[in-house]
């Protein structure tokens, strides 16, 4: 079965993102196809490479990145939500005159069209 996940909670402070990550791992372990993860609203903080958890905590941002690298899962973040919350790639940083970018490698700034496409091409869309 083909799945897409929507994450609306930040990497830390709520359970949404960590539950979504555990669900993603379980899907893959059971042989399902996870096509994409779409990060929306506060979920865009999952793509901030400046996030620095304590040494005894799981690094969820890097966990998502590994999911992308190892399993080819598309990690799309809503560009409008990201810009409002200060998460930018190099192109947007340049366009906005910012000194640097902070989008974690493996994540892509996307529009809601990426979510619509996932909804049309997947058997299930699960929101956290």
UniProtKB/Swiss-Prot annotation:
<comment type="similarity">
    <text>Belongs to the DsrE/TusD family.</text>
</comment>
<feature type="active site" description="Cysteine persulfide intermediate">
    <location>
        <position position="78"/>
    </location>
</feature>
<dbReference type="InterPro" id="IPR017463">
    <property type="entry name" value="Sulphur_relay_TusD/DsrE"/>
</dbReference>
<dbReference type="GO" id="GO:1990228">
    <property type="term" value="C:sulfurtransferase complex"/>
</dbReference>
<keyword id="KW-0963">Cytoplasm</keyword>
<protein>
    <recommendedName>
        <fullName>Sulfurtransferase TusD</fullName>
        <ecNumber>2.8.1.-</ecNumber>
    </recommendedName>
</protein>
<keyword id="KW-0808">Transferase</keyword>
<dbReference type="GO" id="GO:0016783">
    <property type="term" value="F:sulfurtransferase activity"/>
</dbReference>
<dbReference type="GO" id="GO:0002143">
    <property type="term" value="P:tRNA wobble position uridine thiolation"/>
</dbReference>
<comment type="function">
    <text>Part of a sulfur-relay system required for 2-thiolation of 5-methylaminomethyl-2-thiouridine (mnm(5)s(2)U) at tRNA wobble positions. Accepts sulfur from TusA and transfers it in turn to TusE.</text>
</comment>
<keyword id="KW-0819">tRNA processing</keyword>
<dbReference type="GO" id="GO:0097163">
    <property type="term" value="F:sulfur carrier activity"/>
</dbReference>
<dbReference type="Pfam" id="PF02635">
    <property type="entry name" value="DsrE"/>
</dbReference>
<dbReference type="InterPro" id="IPR003787">
    <property type="entry name" value="Sulphur_relay_DsrE/F-like"/>
</dbReference>
<comment type="subunit">
    <text>Heterohexamer, formed by a dimer of trimers. The hexameric TusBCD complex contains 2 copies each of TusB, TusC and TusD. The TusBCD complex interacts with TusE.</text>
</comment>
<dbReference type="InterPro" id="IPR027396">
    <property type="entry name" value="DsrEFH-like"/>
</dbReference>
């Amino acid at each position: 079965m083909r799945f897409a996940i929507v994450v609306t909670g930040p990497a830390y402070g709520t359970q949404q993102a960590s539950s979504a990550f555990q669900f993603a791992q379980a899907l893959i372990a059971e042989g399902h196809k996870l096509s994409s993860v779409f990060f929306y609203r506060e979920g865009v903080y999952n793509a901030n490479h400046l996030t620095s958890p304590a040494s005894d905590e799981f690094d969820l941002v890097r966990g998502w990145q590994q999911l992308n690298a190892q399993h080819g899962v598309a990690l799309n973040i809503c560009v409008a939500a990201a810009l409002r919350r200060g998460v930018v790639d190099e192109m947007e940083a340049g366009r906005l005159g910012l000194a640097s970018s902070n989008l974690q490698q493996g994540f892509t700034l996307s529009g809601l069209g990426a979510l619509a496409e996932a909804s049309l091409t997947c058997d299930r869309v699960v929101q956290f």
